[in-house]
Amino acid sequence: MRKTMKLVALILSCLMVLGILSACGKKNDTIKLGWMGSLTGDQAAYGTCESQTLKMLVEEKNAAGGILGKQIELICYDTKGDAQEAVNVAKRLCAQDKVCAIIGPNASGQCIAIQSVLDQYKVPDLSTVATNEKVTVQDGKLKEYNFRVCFLDPQQGKIAGSFVYDELKLTKAAILYDINDDYAKGLKDNFIKVFTAKGGTVVAEEAYTGGDTDFTAQLTKIKEAGPQIIFTPIFYQDFIMIHKQARTLGIDLPMLGGDGCASEVLFDAADAVDGSYVINHVSLVDPAGDSFRKQYADKWNGAKMELNGYMAHDAFLLWCAAVEKAGSVDPQAIAKAYCEVEVNGMAGKIKISATDHNPVGKSGCVEQIDGKNKTYKFITYIAAD
């Protein structure tokens, strides 16, 4: 009986060792890349496109042999458009999933909130469209593990102010923005700085709180101020509601939205938004992107490509280059390599500065909404720097 028990114990011990070795082998078979963004909430269209684009690109990369001889495992989580949820997700990706890097989230407030988590676990985050200055540098201090592939609010503010004053030749603007949103406040402040420096006047500056659905009071004051254009540094859902209510009040002025407004969802309110403008990182109608848009549509049952898909593409391209440069999946090595590589993305050449972790030499484009044909009309490119 004792011999039998010893034999059973020996067999169990061997199985445990084999199990541990097998688990260790599996752990090293893949490279874990995290993604976080809004799959639900007001920015769901953006987050969904980001995650679907990355899934498509990872599948393509894996089919071609992966990276460093290993397959990529993409782990995605929904932040629900909430900063605290972004923190929770970042902890899960770093502590439990042990990813080597994170792409996203798709909003400045969420990116700013996760800094402490990135610092604690020393895992780099590469943001797609978070434009607030504080994402990578705050109070003059560089954030070691925060990077981005997009232009910044000061640059977007320059593009907006320059477009209104220099291209449209308009001198009176009103502003309507979400007072609790970092992105909106940053863009608003920088637009005012550039537009007024050129000689323009902000005749009305009205605010609302995120979640509001009635903008009658603000729009009435704006109408009375007599602007020639309304600058709305907000997200597409509010952009649509504000347009509809403005038209009901007899306000037929064009509006100018930032990169948070450019979305295929706008065409659900085609008549209301017709003739207004949006700023973007890349032209949504550039023929150079036709094959990429077709690849996405074929993969996702005819779905339309959002801005975030282009930026997710560029972030993934940069991550791949950094991993290859580092020759390792060590998070700190990847963070270092982000500033040592250069790639040609959908939004142009991307080279990350070691000084501020922002891309250098960026430009932005302005496109007009053609509601009747449900498309965009390219207007111009404006240097961001």
Name the predicted role of every residue range.
Residues 25-27, 45-52, 64-137, 208-215, ...:
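Beta-alpha junction/loop-to-helix N-cap segments that form part of ligand/metal-binding clefts
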Residues 34-55, 77-84, 106-107, 176-185, ...:
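Extracytoplasmic "Venus flytrap"
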Residues 55, 59-66, 91-99, 115-123, ...:
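Sec-exported extracytoplasmic/periplasmic mature domains
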Residues 99-204, 252-278:
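Extracytoplasmic ligand/sensor domains, especially the bilobed periplasmic-binding protein
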Residues 243-313, 369-370, 376-384:
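Extracellular/periplasmic periplasmic-binding protein-like sensory domains
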Residues 25-37, 63-72, 165-171:
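Immediate post-signal peptide segment of exported/extracytoplasmic ligand-binding proteins
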Residues 296-306, 320-376:
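Segments of small-molecule ligand-sensing domains
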Residues 1-32, 63, 381-385:
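Short, low-complexity disordered leader/linker segments with a strong preference
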